[in-house]
Every structure is written in C-alpha cells, then in structure tokens.
C-alpha cells in the first residue's frame, strides 16, 4: 500500500514540475496530403464561341480574316464547276462581251453578267445584304465614295486578290482595282492649236464664264466626287494660284482653303451641265463648231477623235493637274452563293482574255505588264498628271459640296 502511495506522489510531483516549466510547444498541424490526382487532371478547356453563319462562310472560303496569300486554282475551278454559276453586277455594257469570252473558257460554269450602272449596282448590293437574300456573287463596279463610307464598313463585300494578279499595292487596297476611268480637262482641237489654259484656276476667269461643259455634278455623285479631288488637294491648289497670280489667294468666309475657293469660283463661272458623257462631248467637241469651250470629259472617248467623230485633245501639263481618276473595283459579295466561281471570275477578268473588251485607247489597267495602244500614256505617266478620287473625303463631304455648289452656281 505504501508503494502504491509513493507512485501516486511521484506522478503528482512530475506533473507539478512540468507545469512550472511553462506550456510545451504545440506541434504544427499536419498539412493535408496533396491531391495529386486532381492536380494532374487539367481544367476543362473553355469552348470556343460558335461562329456566326457569316464567319463560317468566310472561314470556309478563306476570305476576310481567313484570307491566304496563295490559292489552289485547280481546287477552286473544280468547286466552281460544282457551283455551276456566277452572278456579276457590273456598271459597263462590255460585261456582255466579257461573258462571251468567259463562256468559251469555262463552258461548265454559267455566267449571268448584269450591266446595271453604278448606282444600281450599289442599291442592289445594299438591298440584298440588308434583306439577307443574296443573289450576286461579284461586285464589278466603281462605287466611288460609297465604297469606303458604306459598302466596306458594313462588310457587304470582301477583298480578294488572286495570286496571279500583277498589281502594285496601291491598286489592291482597300479592294482590287480592275481599271481606271480618266476624266481629263480637254479643249476643241479644231478651234485651238494647243490647250488655251495652262493653270486650272484659269477656268474660273471671266473668259470662260458659261464656256465650260461638264456632266451635271448636282445629279451625278461621281462627277461631284471628281470636283472634290480639287478641294481635297488644297495645298496644291494654293500653290497653283500663287504660280498664276503671284500672291496667295484671299479666302472667303465660306472657303476655309484654296480648294473650296476654287470650287466656289468654278461654280460661280456657270459651267454648262449635261446629263451624260456623250452630251458633254457633243457640246464642246463636235466637228465644225465655231464656239470655243473647255470640258471635263472621259479619255476613253478618244477613239472617237481618232475616227473623226469628235475633235478634242487632252490638256496635258495643266497646273496642278490634268484630270481625275475614278476607280473601278472587283470584290466578292458577302455570303455569295457561288464563292469559288466568284474567285475564278476575278482571276479571269484581270487576265488578258478577260479585260480584252475594255482594252481600248484611254482605258488604264493597274497591271504594269499591260501594253497600252500607240500614242497613249502609260499607267505610270498618267498617274503623274491625274489624281485619284479621294473616296473617304468625298463620302464625308458630298452633301455639303452639293449644297455649296448649288448655292454658288452662276452667281456673280
């Protein structure tokens, strides 16, 4: 019994001594074992957002963000044959002859080429795209300011440049140019040995009041866009004024620069409006005329001079410029029902066989390998004496310019 009491006493003493020494450090809790299985398993990948029908069409046809630099033409032609048809909206009557050439080369692919005129190509394209009922495959028209201000921003057409194309970058952006239409300052060659003006400001002088013929810019957006080229190049117009008069132009309250001042004075000088290009030529260049006129006319009408039906010559060398170029474009309609046939048509129409109906004196192609007819300027030469229509500027200023022109037309 005494032994048991001694054991109890010893245990109590040990406990008391431990208490006097302070609390023993607490062991850190053990970390839970890592779940190596869950770490090894990858998190489920997020699903890519589904493509819209338009995006699927673009991806399938390698257009837009899916464009490639090269094309497999054998595969494209085979796919085009399966599509069986291509529908082209053009603004030239020569599309009929081009369609004949196409039929000889691609008899298995029916071509429907429509000469709609520039305004109708635009309205038909916009109407189809907005309704979602797409019929057309190829845009083959100018479009002017509407191209950059409406058609391209709304993705109604898509850029396509065949890898067979021989064009400089400036002729393939924002779309591939098919040809250039040159409007030139011209004079009656029976009544003048040379151009009677050397500076574009001279056409605003009293001598030429009511003596300048032009396609009506109030009813033709293309003509008004060409006049806006002179407004856009305000610095060059200012320098031309200084070269002619020896001092800087005095601006009016409604003319912020020399470009707008020229347009105002041009309108005030009462140019004679005509409904179309043929009427312009008849009004200033009919053989046997006795009244002297100047005009803005199409250089592509020069074959009529060579055949003796008209009498005019271009005013090459006028300061600061002799004319304005209107761009004609090729593009594939958004969600075209026959996209491969559309690609094949664009490749064809920029080839020698395809462009043949337009390969006449006065028409320029952006292909540097094209040999121009004898006596005609080359594309490099004509680009030095003409301006391109500034399409974005024209889009932003067409309404204002039309009102401005009308307000000043024929005013003293």
Protein language model features and the residues they cover:
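Extracytoplasmic ligand-binding site segments that recognize negatively charged/polar headgroups
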Residues: 89-100, 112-126, 134-285
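Paired acidic/hydrophobic, glycine-rich loop segments that form the ligand-binding mouth/hinge
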Residues: 88, 132-141, 273, 290-298, ...
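A ligand-binding cleft/hinge motif common to bilobed small-molecule-binding domains
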Residues: 145-150, 292-312
């Amino acid at each position: 019994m005494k032994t048991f009491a001694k054991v109890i006493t010893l245990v109590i003493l040990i406990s008391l001594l431990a208490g006097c020494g302070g609390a023993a450090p607490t062991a850190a809790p053990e970390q839970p074992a890592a779940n190596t299985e869950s770490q090894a398993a990858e998190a489920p990948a997020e699903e890519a957002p589904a493509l819209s029908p338009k995006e699927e069409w673009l991806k399938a046809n390698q257009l837009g963000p899916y464009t490639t630099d090269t094309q497999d033409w054998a595969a494209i032609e085979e796919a085009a044959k399966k599509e069986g048809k291509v529908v082209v909206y053009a603004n030239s009557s020569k599309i009929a002859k081009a369609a004949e050439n196409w039929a000889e080369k691609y008899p298995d692919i029916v071509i429907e080429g429509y000469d709609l005129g520039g305004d109708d190509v635009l309205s038909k394209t916009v109407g189809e795209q907005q309704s979602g009922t797409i019929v057309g495959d190829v845009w083959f028209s100018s479009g002017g300011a509407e191209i950059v201000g409406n058609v391209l921003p709304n993705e109604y057409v898509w850029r396509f440049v065949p890898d067979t194309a021989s064009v400089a970058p400036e002729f393939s952006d924002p779309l591939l140019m098919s040809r250039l239409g040159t409007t030139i300052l011209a004079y009656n060659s029976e009544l003048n040995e040379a151009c009677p003006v050397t500076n574009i400001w001279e056409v605003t002088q009293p001598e030429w009041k009511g003596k300048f013929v032009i396609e009506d810019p109030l009813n033709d957006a293309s003509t008004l866009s060409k006049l806006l080229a002179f407004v856009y190049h305000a610095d060059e117009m200012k320098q031309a004024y200084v070269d002619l008069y020896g001092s800087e132009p005095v601006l009016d309250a409604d003319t912020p620069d020399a470009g707008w001042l020229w347009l105002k004075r041009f309108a005030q000088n009462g140019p004679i409006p005509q409904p179309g290009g043929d009427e312009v030529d008849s009004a200033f260049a009919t053989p046997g005329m006795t009244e002297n006129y100047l005009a803005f006319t199409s250089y592509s009408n020069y074959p009529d001079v060579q055949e003796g039906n008209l009498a005019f010559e271009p005013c090459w060398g006028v300061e600061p410029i002799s004319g304005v170029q209107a761009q004609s474009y090729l593009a594939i309609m958004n969600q075209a029902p026959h996209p491969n046939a559309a690609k094949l048509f664009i490749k064809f129409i920029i080839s020698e066989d395809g462009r043949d109906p337009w390969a006449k004196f006065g028409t320029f192609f952006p292909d540097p390998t094209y040999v121009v007819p004898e006596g005609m300027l080359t594309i490099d030469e004509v680009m030095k004496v003409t301006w391109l229509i500034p399409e974005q500027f024209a889009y932003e200023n067409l309404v204002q310019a039309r009102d401005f022109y009308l307000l000043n037309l024929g005013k003293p």
